[in-house]
Structures are given as structure tokens and as C-alpha cells.
Amino acid sequence: MNKTFKYIVLLALACFVGKANAQELKTEVFSLLNLDYPGLEKVKALHQEGKDADAAKALLDYYRARTNVKTPDINLKKVTIGKDEQKMADEALQHTFFAHKGYQPSFNYGEDIDWRYWPVKDNELRWQLHRHKWFTPMGKAYRVSGDEKYAVEWTKQYIDWIKKNPLVKVDKKEYEMTGDNQLKGDVENARFAWRPLEVSNRLQDQTSQFQLFLPSPSFTPEFLTEFLVNYHKHAIHILGIYSAQGNHLLFEAQRMIYAGAFFPEFKEAAAWRKSGIDIMNREINVQVYNDGGQFELDPHYHLAAINIFCKALNIADLYGFRNEFPQEYLDTIEKMIVFYANVSFPDYTNPCFSDAKLTNKKEMLKNYRNWSKMFPKNQFIKYLATDGKEGALPEYLSKGFLKSGFFVFRNSWGTDATQMVVKAGPKAFWHCQPDNGTFELWFNGKNLFPDSGSYVYAGEGEVMEQRNWHRQTCVHNTVTLNNKNLDQTESVTKLWQPEGNVQILVTENPSYKNLKHRRSVFFVDNSYFVIVDEMVGSQKGSINLHYQMPKGEIANSREDMTFVTQFEEGSNMKLQCFGPEGMTMKKEPGWCSTAYRKRYKRMNVSFNVKKDSEDAVRYITVICPIKNSADAPKLSAKFKNKTFNENGLEVEVKVNGKKQSLNYKL
């Protein structure tokens, strides 16, 4: 009797689990579709006769026969899969899900998938789980191998996700973790599973997954109705809860265009598409300054914004509604590309200011090739797209983007260039760090002053500590008061002179209450830099001038405040700081991050002065890029104007005895 009872319980449990994952015919799908859409005549007739199961079969037949709808993301005639994607697909069969590339090896989410499992309290890990990055590789694996196991598992996981992640009412601010951290149950889960950005991710990617798995026997009429009802719920959700601003809003709008274009059978499809187009046309004027800089002042998200705007155009070209984007929209994208090309280094990499990640040449060549198709007359873009084989470089070398606050000093466009990129712009948004005045410096094939980067975004405990460390003003190449973060980030350009033997940038930031920072940068004879920092105001405390050193052996001296890299011949530098009497130098361990959860150790340096009066604290730093450290020049520098002058500056610098007077008047 006991064994029989046990068997009945197990059988009931098996039936319950089977039913939980079973595909159900969702008849509400017919009320969501425009059954008068061309090709749906049979579906409409069967539905009106009350034969919804047959209508669902006819609907599946319609989608399998549909040829006029596709996306630019996948070519069904030439599906290929790489080694990494194959691994993602195979691991997903065992519920080991590739949620985030920063957390490898991937975590396993259990035989009975626990979509709420959060092994490391990093918000990105939990959010990005719900982007289902392994679904498209599973689809590719299915198409390449023909093995039904991928389709079977995909449909199971898709239904399982729907069942375990209900859309419940969540206050909008909760999606960005700015509200109540005590939320429980479905509400706590929904802030991750149904954040608009993740929803938009699924909206876009499921158009590819739909195409990849559509021929499978596992893609049943019942599953089709589940899929379409869920997809519709996604679009309606975003429509009512778009993010307020920034790159999230752009992603969501662009993906709503995808949804409306790929599933024109939905009654609201045209409204979805229009919603996305209207936002894109509006936000390109809101988020992009007239110099081409994106208002988050982060090279990574600037690049993302370019590609979002381009993706919207690509889908418009595919479906014939390019005329809904004005010429001004294209002109702005072109300016954004020119901006990005200018602030990038000769090897196609980018400064890692703010939350930027390091790109690579292969990735950027692909981008420039795509952009060159869109702007075939732009010779600069063509030059970069062809790695210099075609097109032409601009006639200028140094270039300033005054509204965005990015300034580039360069003496060449080649890899042998000396190039400094300075970031000193207006107040920006979440991804921007309080680092006004910072810079990166490239010389002859090497970045000698890489930014500290970001490492992680947000989360709990250690994750937030790591985030906050990389965001600090004091781990950038700029000046602080008592090593504290800047109170204000609203730099104003006082002078930009990008031509001649002495090129000059003068930028000023309010920084702290009663203490402003004026930074003057001189690029002398296309060979070395003189940076003058003046901290002006009644505020008292410790003034700290920070420099983040490159990785490797660096000889240094407290006596004369010098640092000379000891790298192999090709790219080295000497830095020497000249400050007030009593200035001290401090060396600390630092970090440099170029990708999410990847970083390496290096040395941070600060030159510290006690400010105990209203007199300005002033520094002169000379940075000489040199090929061989043995050739480090002898340096000296002094102020010619004895006190801070609101309207000008004059300093005298000697390099190996050669005197150079540097000055300006405002």
C-alpha cells in the first residue's frame, strides 16, 4: 500500500511538472491579431467557426510560408555557428546559462530552472540573465546540426520562463533599483525580469529565434500562440513604461521598431513602429550635441548610440519607411562617427573614460565598413573602413569638440603619433564619471596613461565597493580636494587653439564649493605636453594632483618628483611635477579596467599640497613622450606670473636647456 501511494504521488508530481511545461493553446491570440491582414483569411474563417485549434495550425502554416518579412540580423540561407556560440548552446541544454561574459564559467540554474538564482549580487548578472543570450546560439545550433534537442529544450525554457516570471505591477523607479530594496516575491523578481531594457532585448532577439526555430516540429501551433501572446505583452509593456532618457530609451525605441516591422499582423504593430520612430527622431536631437558627442560622454555608449540609430535606419530600408527619418537624422549620425573616429587612437581602440570598454580593431573595422555603406561620400569613414587603402584623412590634426568637452591633440594620424585626448565637458548622466580634466595619452603604439575604467556597474556589498573605487575622481588624471569626488562637473572651455607650434587648451571646472580648477594644456612643438593646474578659491584643505601610471617598471624620485617608464624601446615617457614648496608625493596601488570584471594592478601617484589660505595652489607638470627611457630629458619649469591671473598665464619651461615661454591671454 505504501509503495502504491508513493507511486501515485510521484505520478501526480510528474503530471504536474509536465503540465507546467506543457504548451497550451492561447485563444486570446486571435483578438491581438488583425485577422484581415493579407494571408490570414483562412485563420479568420476557422476562428469565426470556433475551430481555434485548426486556426492556430493555419496561423503556423502562414508564418512558415511568409517570405516578405525578415530582419538584417540573420541570414537563414547561410547560418553558421562559432565555437563560443556552440558552447553556449550545449551548456544551455544542461541549464548552464551564459548570462554575462564577465562571469565565466557560467552558472548552472538547476534542473528545475531557478530564474531568481543570484549567485553574485551584481545587478547586471541578474538583469542580463533575462536577456536569454543563449537562445539565439541554440537556434543556430539547431539549424546547423538539425538536432531537434535544441528546439525541444528552447521551447521548454521559453514556456518555463513565462510561467515563472509573471508580469506584476512594479513602480517604475524600482526597475533601476532606486526604490525599496525590501521588495519580495514576484514584485522583487519583476524589477529584473521585466525591466524595459531587458524586455526590449528579448523583443529584438526573439525575431531571430522565431525564424531559426520556426521549421521545428517542436514549434507547434500551441507554442506559436504562447509565443505571440508573450511577445505582444512585451511590446505593450514597453509602450507604457519607456525609460526616461539615455541609451536605454534608444535601445527600447529601436527595438519597438523591430517589433512593429517584424510582426505587422498585430493590431498595434503600426503604433509600435511609429512610437519607436518618433522617439528616435526626437532623442537624436536631445542626446547628441551639435558637435556630434552623445550626452553620456562615454565612448562606449557613444558607439552604442551610433549603432542604435543605424539599426533603425537599416530596418527602415528593409521595409521601405526610410522617408520617416529626416536628412538631419543622417547628418547627425555622420557627425557622431567623425567624433568617435577623432577621439579614438590610431589602432582603432578608444579611451576608457567613464564606463567605456576597450574596443578592438577587428570590431571597429566591421563598424566602419557598415557606416561607410551608409555614408559612401565620406572619405574619412572610407579611409577607416579600408584601413587606409581608400578614402582620405582630414586635413586637420588636432580637433576640439567644445560642446561635449572632448579635445584631441595629435601630431599624426599614424600609429607613431603622439595623441592626447582630454575629457572636460558638461554635467552628464549615470555612465559618466566625475573626472573633469582627465586625459589619456598615446605615443608611438602605446597608451601611456590609460583611464581606470569602470570594472562593474552596480550591485550589493563588494560589487558596489568595486564600482565606487573606479568612479572616484582621485583615480583619474585630475585634481581633487581632500581626495574627494568632485561636487560639480560643469567644465567651461576658456580657450582652444589647435594649430601652431604651441597648441593650447584652457578649461575650467567649478569642482568644489569656493574652489575652482583651471587646467591649461600646452602641446609644444608637436612633441611634449605642459599641464598647468591652478586651484582657486577660499576653500582650504589638501589639494591633490593625481596621475595614473601605466603598467610596468617605472623609475621615480621623490627628490625631484619624476617618473620615467622603463619599457622596451619604442614608447616611454618622463613625467615631472613642479609645485609649491612643501609639496609631497604619494604612491598608491591602483587598478586599470578595460572590460567588465577584468582589471590589472598599477601605480597611482598624487602630488599633495596643503592649502591653508586663499592663495591659489598651482602646479606645472611636464610630460615628455620618448622612445627610449635612457633619452629622458632634463626638465625645469616655473611660473612667470607670480600669482593666479584670471585673464592669463605665463610659464617658462626648459627641456634639455632649451627655454620655452608658454602663455595666453583670455
Curated annotation (Swiss-Prot):
Its EC number is 4.2.2.8. The active site is at Y301. One of its GO terms (molecular function) is heparin-sulfate lyase activity. Residues 1-22 form the signal peptide. The keyword Ribonucleoprotein does not apply. Changing C624A: Impaired catalytic activity. It is found in: Periplasm. Its main location: periplasm. GO terms for cellular component: periplasmic space. Keywords: Lyase, Periplasm, Signal. It catalyses: Elimination of sulfate, appears to act on linkages between N-acetyl-D-glucosamine and uronate. Product is an unsaturated sugar. Changing C577A: Does not affect much catalytic activity. It comes from the Bacteria. Pfam families: Hepar_II_III_C, Hepar_II_III_N. PANTHER family: HEPARIN-SULFATE LYASE. Belongs to the polysaccharide lyase 12 family. Specifically cleaves heparan sulfate-rich regions of acidic polysaccharides. Also able to degrade heparin and hyaluronic acid. Does not act on N,O-desulfated glucosamine or N-acetyl-O-sulfated glucosamine linkages. Functions in cleaving metazoan heparan sulfate and providing carbon, nitrogen and sulfate sources for microorganisms. This is Heparin-sulfate lyase. It comes from Bacteroides stercoris.
